Amino acid sequence: MSVLDDIVAGVRLDLAERESATSLADLRAALADVDPPRDPMPHFRAAGSSVIAEVKRRSPSKGDLATIPDPAELARSYAAGGAAAISVLTEQRRFGGSLADLRAVRAAVDTPILRKDFIVSSYQVVEARAAGADLVLLIVAALDDDDLRRLHDEARELGLTALVEVHDEPETERAVALGAELVGVNARNLKTLAIHDDTFGRLAPLVPDDRVKVAESGIFGPDDVARFVREGARAVLVGEALVKDGDPEGAVRRMTGVES
């Protein structure tokens, strides 16, 4: 079993518990009380680099990264630094995240929020919107074509922007065929956790220029951002480097607006 398969198996177990506690119908009813979703795309299409700043306590590859006792405070720092969006990990077994973190961040900032998780069910898409998310992550490697299209369509129906994540050429072709407007290229292989520095440069040319390309993993400072911008990135998703920085606001500011 690959790392990705193991994570998804755990996600499905946790999902079953939440489904037994709150019905999909009740979740949908809760949408009436949620503010309309925010559109992140104008930020991503602006000149220079945009930053998706992540609230991330730990990862399968690095273990514990940061305690983050107050995700709302961290999110306010990111927003003050000019983050175009804030990514909140909600997977608990491997990443130490929760929907409570997402709700806390939503209450603290007006910045668009990405629910970063392993989305495999319609329930999770509705759950994301009910918690106040504006974007959801869809990992191509975790979904077959039918599920990928269904979840992408359901996200759009709810006004959510889907960040469609790819790791290799076949996945990139699937994302392009899907019509994904926001394509994330992750340098980390989720099946092995290895990082390949050439992944973005190899895959970005396969994505049409009218789509927004997001570089993910292996980004630690403005020099990394500049390299990805030269290769076609409009945005970068950064987690570890920001949660470990004593000045997350300044770190986001230094990575924002970088041009080739």
From Swiss-Prot:
The record's catalysed reaction(s) read: 1-(2-carboxyphenylamino)-1-deoxy-D-ribulose 5-phosphate + H(+) = (1S,2R)-1-C-(indol-3-yl)glycerol 3-phosphate + CO2 + H2O
Q: In which pathway does it act?
A: Amino-acid biosynthesis; L-tryptophan biosynthesis; L-tryptophan from chorismate: step 4/5
Respond yes or no to whether keyword Amino-acid biosynthesis is given for this record: yes
Q: Which UniProt keywords apply?
A: Amino-acid biosynthesis, Aromatic amino acid biosynthesis, Decarboxylase, Lyase, Tryptophan biosynthesis
Name a GO molecular-function annotation.
Answer: phosphoribosylanthranilate isomerase activity
Its EC number(s) = 4.1.1.48
One biological-process term from Gene Ontology? Answer: L-tryptophan biosynthetic process
Q: Does the keyword Amino-acid biosynthesis apply?
A: yes
Which InterPro entries does its entry note? Answer: Aldolase_TIM, Indole-3-glycerol_P_synth, Indole-3-glycerol_P_synth_dom, Indole-3-GlycerolPSynthase_CS, RibuloseP-bd_barrel
Similarity section: Belongs to the TrpC family.
Protein name, please? Indole-3-glycerol phosphate synthase
